[in-house]
Amino acid sequence: MTVQIPKLLFLHGFLQNGKVFSEKSSGIRKLLKKANVQCDYIDAPVLLEKKDLPFEMDDEKWQATLDADVNRAWFYHSEISHELDISEGLKSVVDHIKANGPYDGIVGFSQGAALSSIITNKISELVPDHPQFKVSVVISGYSFTEPDPEHPGELRITEKFRDSFAVKPDMKTKMIFIYGASDQAVPSVRSKYLYDIYLKAQNGNKEKVLAYEHPGGHMVPNKKDIIRPIVEQITSSLQEASE
């Protein structure tokens, strides 16, 4: 009898690639490898031009970005959420899963975490016959929101993506949220908003929906005291679901 090695799919952030995300998440990756978990890092399909950036970058730094092959994204950035088009990024991940899956779980960072949340919710529809993920790790993740006209000062999921971020009541996936208290790119309040969607869908079950805040910024934590309990939750969810 052959033992199947658990497999996790990793989706990098804006202006990264799989290789860079592998390096940035080396602490978690190495602990998972020790636990005999396979980590697959893939590249986003959208190749950005300098004009696509939501901030200024000098020519020298942009050339270095091109040389390092990190001018990548899962979708083009927009401050107006209903203008976002995730179809190309979504298709590339779905095609990879169909060719290389099934996967036991998914890990996303920032833009990759927004996409991985949607894939977690919709995996059975996107890839027919693929089981629900056992675990989904959302690092500096966020949803696509807009001002709620019925509740001034509050946000709601943008109508275009309401179905994408809808959590099914029978979801069995363990959700693990990681975010930085000092994150300026994706403020922790945005990650907590997404966390609350899942927590509410699971009737407040904090054994199925976990949150870990670290003191850093827009990054994957690598300090052992922070990541050890996270990796333990990942590996235990893989084992529980296999038993």
From Swiss-Prot:
GO MF: hydrolase activity; hydrolase activity, acting on ester bonds; lysophospholipase activity
SUPFAM superfamilies: alpha/beta-Hydrolases
GO CC, any one term: nucleus
Subcellular location: Cytoplasm; Nucleus
Keyword terms: Cytoplasm, Hydrolase, Nucleus, Serine esterase
The organism's place on the tree of life at top rank: Eukaryota
Keyword Nucleus: yes
Disulfide topology: none
BP GO annotations: apoptotic process
Top EC category: hydrolase
Keyword Mitochondrion: no
Catalytic residues of the enzyme: 110 (charge relay system), 183 (charge relay system), 218 (charge relay system)
EC code(s) of this entry: 3.1.-.-
Function, as annotated: Serine hydrolase of unknown specificity.
Family of the protein in this entry: Belongs to the AB hydrolase 3 family.
Further facts: Present with 14600 molecules/cell in log phase SD medium.
Protein name as it appears in the record: Family of serine hydrolases 1
Native source species: Saccharomyces cerevisiae (strain ATCC 204508 / S288c)
Taxonomic lineage: Eukaryota, Fungi, Dikarya, Ascomycota, Saccharomycotina
